[in-house]
Amino acid sequence: MGKFGGIILILILLMWCCNTRKTVVEFNLIGSSGIQPELVVNGEEREIEVDDSGYAKLMLTEGEHGYATLKYGKDRLPLFIEDGTTLRIYIYGDHAKGNIRFEGDGSPKNSYLNSQVMKNLSFDYELNAPEFLDQLKDLIQEQFHYLDTMGFDAAFAEMERNRIKFSTYKALENYPLYHAWSTGNMDYQPDTAYLSCIKKLIKEDEKLLVLKEYQEGMASLVSLISTYHMKELDAYKQVMAQFDYVIHHLTNETLVEFLIDHYAYAYLLGVGIDEHIDDVLRVYDFYVKDPALRKRFQEIYDRCAKIVPGSPAFDFMFTDIAGQAVELEDFRGKYLFINVWTTWGVPCRYENLAWEKLEKEFEDENIVFVAVSCDNDRAVWEKRVRENPKGEVQLYMGSDRSFMDFYMIRGIRRS
């Protein structure tokens, strides 16, 4: 190649580099008290370091695009990051929901995903099964109609249709229990027509696994169809029924691996390391080979190992109604029954009756019943305790959630 040929080649390469568009996400936090946003793309979590003015610029690499999640404090917002686009995100205050704005060529799809039309889905669980199914169809069609008005490209629109469907399908798993509660018919069981509809909705499509809604929707549908006949709540029987359905009715290896991991992980979170864990691990080890999934599972297994019976208790320090510190050492020589609750939790209020019966049953034993509130507002907790004095020890956790983290308490109430 001659001298001029080499120069032309260099110029072509320079022009190609200049024309290759970067994928950029900019963050502008206005009025924030120091919350650090996090971006989850393709399952990978990235912390965003903003400067003193609340600004951060993130250059994404090839492959870091598609559906994503923005974590901001307790808020979780959907994003769609398009290759070669710039997305500018403005968040006002410490709560992103309802206080977020988008600019740049990546703005339209993200504004759509975070619009009110795509959020406020409510379900009437008192409806009978056919009516409930019709309600879901109407909600899906309503969202489809809104999507069609946006004029997005065909590929995104098709993926969105699947995301909408499986997001809405999640309500199907809740229906039997919520219908029983709302109607007072605690013996309710879904009929064959309802179950037949569920089976038709189970769709194996590996390319949809990039959608969190597809993952959750499929997990819900398979869980419902595999455990509907169980009248008692037995976590071990439930997870083995879920495994059995996945193994004998699904064929896509990637989907099978995902669902086995999903159910085993949920079992570990809910039950911990118990006498049945070896059975769960045998199935898990046979079907789950993905290193990332196994790493995540091992991490939660190691955490569960710290709280098996006989392990040292968490050395907590909370405060009582008078503001005095109360710590684990104060109960040396006693058995503790600790209940984590909040004043606003409806299940907490309903279960108080069972809690009081338990107290009475063991009132002559060497057991101390301790109710620990994780309310954000101490004044609200104090008001409730003073208005409804109970026999148990009442403590306030405050903002430190290390106790809940240690015992992996994700929902309340939890004892």
For each predicted feature, which ranges?
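Bacterial Sec-dependent N-terminal signal peptides
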Residues: 1-26
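A non-transmembrane, solvent-exposed segment enriched in polar/low-complexity residues
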Residues: 18-159, 163-166, 170-189
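Alpha-helical repeat scaffolds
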Residues: 182-199, 236-247, 274-285, 314-315
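Long, charge-rich alpha-helical interaction segments
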Residues: 208, 213-274, 296
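N-terminal "domain-start" segment that seeds a small globular fold
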Residues: 295-328, 390
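Conserved redox-active cysteine motifs that mediate thiol-disulfide chemistry
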Residues: 332, 340-357
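Thiol-based oxidoreductase modules, predominantly thioredoxin-like and allied folds used
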Residues: 365-380, 389-401
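Thiol/disulfide oxidoreductase modules built on the thioredoxin-like
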Residues: 390, 398-415
